[in-house]
């Protein structure tokens, strides 16, 4: 288990402005004030583990004696040897600050600020992985991001990494959602072929979409009809 704490986070104001669909003006000036007050509350950190795949199956892999079940993992990691399960968070303080505001627009802006901070921290972590392990290209998958890797798979993923709560303060609730809310988890893996989980997700109105839906590729992971 390795911990990076803190992960430096410098918010990209252009990205934030785009996600808020705002133009320069009075309202944007108010957002900049929120950014200034929010910045000290962002405490980005990550815990991860370097794992070598012990067993490979059509519907998953085994890491450190623990099986992860997902046909997407089974296929995407078929040629992989080493992978990096991780949990990353920006901590609870920004989320707690959001509750102190009564106006919806302020709460919404702080929520988006948190999202941008989380994405920024994740990108920074990815670059650190590439540099440390001399990797050119990487892709990632996370439990709950696709039907083919359901959210209850968070539990074995956390078990593989170790004591995530002691390391960075992230826990799972009974629905396998992470606390603090602004946290992400998954597996990074080296790849020669660019891949985004978005390619397998049909949701059309997702504001976080990074790649177009690939219906043909997604069909490969649909449950097969076994009736005769």
Question: How does the language model describe each region?
Answer:
Residues 1-102, 106, 222-228:
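Active-site helix-to-loop segments that bind/position phosphate- or nucleotide-bearing substrates
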Residues 29, 33, 116, 120, ...:
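Conserved active-site and cofactor/substrate-binding residues in soluble primary-metabolism enzymes
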Residues 38-42, 129, 133, 202-205:
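Structural signal for hydrophobic packing residues in well-ordered secondary-structure cores
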Residues 98, 210-217:
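Short conserved micro-motifs at the rims of enzyme active sites and ligand-binding pockets
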Residues 115-121, 202, 217-221:
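Short C-terminal domain-edge/linker segments immediately following a structured domain
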Residues 71-75, 205, 210-213:
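Metal/cofactor-centered catalytic core regions of large enzymes
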Residues 77-142, 146:
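Conserved mixed alpha/beta catalytic, RNA-binding, or beta-rich assembly cores of soluble enzyme
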Residues 136-210, 219-228:
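Short terminal or interdomain "cap/linker" segment that borders an active site or interface and mediates
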């Amino acid at each position: 288990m390795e911990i990076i704490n803190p992960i430096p986070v410098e918010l990209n104001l252009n990205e934030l402005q785009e996600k808020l669909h705002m133009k320069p003006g009075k309202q944007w000036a108010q957002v900049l004030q929120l950014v200034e007050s929010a910045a000290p509350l962002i405490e980005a950190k990550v815990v991860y583990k370097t794992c070598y795949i012990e067993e490979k199956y059509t519907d998953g892999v085994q890491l450190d004696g623990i099986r992860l079940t997902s046909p997407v993992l089974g296929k995407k990691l078929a040629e992989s040897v080493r992978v990096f399960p991780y949990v990353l968070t920006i901590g609870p303080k920004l989320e707690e600050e959001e509750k102190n505001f009564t106006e919806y627009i302020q709460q919404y802006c702080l929520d988006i600020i948190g999202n941008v901070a989380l994405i920024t921290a994740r990108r920074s972590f990815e670059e650190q992985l590439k540099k440390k392990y001399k990797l050119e290209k990487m892709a990632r998958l996370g439990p709950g991001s696709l039907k083919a890797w359901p959210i209850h798979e968070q539990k074995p993923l956390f078990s593989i990494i170790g004591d995530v709560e002691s390391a960075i303060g992230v826990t799972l609730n009974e629905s396998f959602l992470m606390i603090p809310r602004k946290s992400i988890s998954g597996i990074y893996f080296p790849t020669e072929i660019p891949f985004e989980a978005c390619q397998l997700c049909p949701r059309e109105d997702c504001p976080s979409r990074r790649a177009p839906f690939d219906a043909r590729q997604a069909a490969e992971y649909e449950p097969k009809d076994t009736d005769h």
